[in-house]
Swiss-Prot record:
Originating organism: Escherichia coli (strain K12)
Domain HTH deoR-type: 5-61
InterPro entries hit by this protein: Carb_Metab_HTH_regulators, DeoR-like_C, DeoR_HTH, NagB/RpiA_transferase-like, Tscrpt_reg_HTH_DeoR_CS, WH-like_DNA-bd_sf
Gene from which this protein is expressed: sgcR
Molecular functions per Gene Ontology: cis-regulatory region sequence-specific DNA binding; ligand-modulated transcription factor activity
Keywords from the named record: DNA-binding, Transcription, Transcription regulation
Protein's UniProt name: Putative sgc region transcriptional regulator
């Protein structure tokens, strides 16, 4: 059975996010799509995501565009089902009266969306998340000030670090670009590293939210060792063999099938 367009688009966007270039021939070989299907999907992507450039028989991810909103839109599309699963699990760990840090990123945004009926205090470092929380009447939300990363809407740099020092909370929900048993939590850029590290330092309990694609991967910038993390929340796409390996290493995993 051939894949539906939304599934094809997600596969192509995921490849483009990682490699910044996808040719018609590559899409045909990697995903088994017909040439006519690839061409139609390329045109659809260009129409929906203005930062994508269609060349002769290819698509390119335009990092130089002034329209940075699409960068966030692409990232939010990747592993969207997994992110919603993770957010739903994380929501079960939150009770009325809690005060916690909520990190930046699309998975954390999904958790923010789950807080509409919560009576909590949330400190965040993300413009999108702050905007979401500001709509909920019983959520007392604080946003950390500092430099905003274009296209990602996270807040960082030295001013943000100073403001985080004003808080000390019971729990933090953080995200990451990659994690492995050997190198711990790592990030693709330095921008969020300082904030993540400081949030971990100012929290008594740290919950890492990471979809299955983040496991056994390494990015250039170190954030923390896994010993700093109390619980890792992931999705149903995490292979059992990987889950068992992390559990044997002492990691506490919270997965959809953990709920009986």
């Amino acid at each position: 059975m051939s894949q539906q367009r939304p599934d094809r688009i997600k596969q192509m966007l995921h490849y483009l996010w990682q490699h910044r270039h996808l040719s018609t021939q590559q899409a045909m070989e990697l995903f088994g799509y017909a040439e006519a299907t690839v061409r139609r999907d390329f045109q659809y992507i260009v129409n929906q995501y203005p930062g994508m450039i269609r060349g002769h028989g290819c698509l390119d991810f335009d990092d130089s565009t002034d329209d940075k909103e699409y960068v966030f839109d692409v990232k939010r599309t990747l592993q969207s089902v997994a992110k919603r699963e993770i957010a739903a699990l994380a929501r079960t760990m939150i009770k009325d009266g809690d005060c916690f840090f909520l990190d930046s990123g699309s998975t954390c945004l999904e958790l923010a969306k789950c807080l509409a009926d919560a009576r909590v205090k949330v400190i965040c470092n993300d413009i999108k998340i702050a905007n979401e929380l500001g709509c909920f009447p019983h959520v007392e939300s604080y946003i950390i000030g500092g430099l905003i990363r274009p296209g990602y809407f996270s807040v960082g740099e030295s001013l943000a670090l100073e403001m985080i020092n004003a808080f000390s909370v019971e729990r933090a929900f953080i995200s990451c670009d990659a994690l492995s048993l050997e190198t711990g939590i790592t990030n693709a850029t330095m921008f969020e590293v300082g904030v993540k590290t400081r949030i971990i330092q100012r929290s008594r309990e740290v919950i890492l939210m990471a979809d299955h694609s983040k496991f056994d991967a390494v990015e250039p910038h170190a954030v923390a060792t896994l010993s700093c993390i109390k619980t890792i929340i992931s999705d149903s796409g995490l292979p059992e063999t990987i889950a068992q390996r992390y559990q044997r290493a002492g990691c506490q995993l919270f997965l959809p099938h953990s709920i009986k």
